Amino acid sequence: LLLPGRSGGGGGVVVVADGAGGKVLGVRRQGARTHWAITAIALVAVGRYPHRKGFGLSAEDRVAIDAALVATGTTSFADRRVTELSGGERARVLMARVLAGEPQWILADEPLANLDPGYQIDMLHLLRDQVGHGKGVVAVLHDLHHAVRFADHVVLLHQGKVFAQGSVADVLTSSNLSAVYGIDAKLFSDEEGTPQLLIKGKTAR
């Protein structure tokens, strides 16, 4: 997981030039939009482009597309035009497009943007499930609480540079959070042993 510092603290761009690159890396860009009045399922089908061997969709393509729609909970509006969907619905369709490509690695830039709290948790569990199936996931998040709960590895950016990287416990220390975010915070485990972050307030910097 890649965790930026304060807003505007630095980001990254991944460009895949090789036509077969989509088999290796699937990218979900922040603020990605579509102005085409195509259906959601047609947009998800675009994710199969790296696997296409001819015209039309193969049986394997259709299985992958259906699985991506189910995983993202977008089946119910798969036949609606993308331009008619809400921001949260479009965000889930765009993730479905990535999943349909069955990449080995997923780069998700702000995958929680425009999602309600419940769907944010669903998205994070979805990404964790991908890891459980042997995929690699790099996600850019600003919400520290989500990073604490779901990250295996954290890269903390500050002023466009790597400030610290490693496990959640090693990176999201009180001193690091104070230096980067200007907050008084500490990690702890709740009664069930789940890591949590307590933010007490701001610190003077």
Go through the PLM ranges and name each one.
Residues 45, 59-77:
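Conserved ABC ATPase "signature" region
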Residues 56, 81-85, 89:
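Conserved ABC ATPase signature
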Residues 102:
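Conserved catalytic motifs of ABC-family nucleotide-binding domains
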Residues 106-110:
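Catalytic Walker B motif of ABC-type/P-loop ATPase nucleotide-binding domains
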Residues 147-149:
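A short, surface-exposed alpha-helical micro-motif characterized by mixed small hydrophobic
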Residues 178-205:
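ABC ATPase nucleotide-binding domains
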